[in-house]
Amino acid sequence: RDLALATAQFWAATPSAPLHWDRASEEGWRKVPSLAAGLPHFASGFMRNWGRDTFIALRGCLLITNRFAEARDTLLVYASVVRHGLCPNLLDAARQPRYNARDATWFFLQAIQDYVEMSPEGLTFMSQTVVLKWPVRDWDPDLVHLEPKTVADLIHLILQAHAKGISFRERNAGPGLDAQMTDKGFDVKVRLEEGTGLIYGGNEWNCGTWMDKMGSSSKAGNKGRPATPRDGAAVEIVGLLKSTLRWVAGLDRGAFPHAAVTTSSGAELSYKEWDARLQHNFERLFWVAPDEKAPTPLRNFYKDIVGATRNWQDYQLRPNFPIAMAVAPELFSPQNARQALALAADRLVGPLGMCTLDPFEAEYRGDYRNDDDSADKSVAHGWNYHQGPEWVWPLGFFLKAWHHFYGKDEGGSSAGRRDVFPWLLKHRSMLHNSAWRSLPELTNSTGSVCSHACPAQAWSVATLLDALHSLEADEALE
């Protein structure tokens, strides 16, 4: 109840950030509310509505709370501004969206799947009309024959664009678009590795996942350098891709009349085969076995990335693999999954959130201060945003993964409440005592207050509500 009530303040209308500016001009901004990423720092203007944040939060904030019309509007507005096969990172009321995120698209597709499965509209949504603001011919003439007419067509277009490969330079690249980024950071590239089914992307000069802190301190020497580029095949993107492929491959052809994509080599790859390749290769590529040669003493966990430019970053223990576990548990060996989750529980889970980096890593810096003007590169201007501070939203996915792989006791009944609730006692206290009646974006080390974080964050509330909702749904079935 407290979590559900906490979602209400994020959905509102504001003159500077309607969901879609063109529609606002026609209907008046009061009729076009949008979902704020966090309060008060992400309340207005182009910083209010983020694709990634929106679709991580949508299930908890809008679907579980039965606000299906709001969820539908949000999905269709973002659908209308897909470009290059990508969902925008910053929506900017659909005026000048920015397409510099590799993961926002996959959270968007997961949100479509969730909407179809949870809303009364169901699969009928797949035939809903979609009209792109920027037609396919403007950004990839090779795919002009796939100009979408429906949501189903749009999903196919996105998957086809990734299978073919995505390569473009951000529009208006330069200091006017991003005052911190270096020239190479504006180049956006994504590719499919046909043999394994993995999607790779990014480079060491940009940061296309949620761990997106770009350095800005000339004094400390981190300006233009991403703290966590995570280029390569990021584990949560692989999980979200698998979830999407499993879903579309299993749909009736009447709801999803597309069976295959064409890869960059010209080969036809069916969705069922793509799904199977991921299933076949995931454990081999991501599991760090006891006998593996690795630049870390840790074993029995899942890599954060495969194929990073800085190859040792593949082996960093971060809270991203539970996201993949929650949306695509079939990828994981149950025995390996339990070992990895136990390690994460020991090393990463804090009082309210999860450490964004293993505290035993040399790069770990657990306290975030955005106003740090020191000469220490590792923390100057908050460069350590995702190098230790404890973010709340990944915990929701961790709890769902934990319940899936540890959720049965020896008698076969649910152990979910017994295991999960102790992790949530401090959240309940926070909801009752916070002036915002909400949960924060993140905390500093060991759960200490971070004054530079939002005290109310949509995805923090949403993923924990989702975890509890899923737990109760499972127990109701039993």
Placement of each model-derived feature along the sequence:
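Acidic, mature catalytic/reactive cores of soluble proteins
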Residues: 1-478
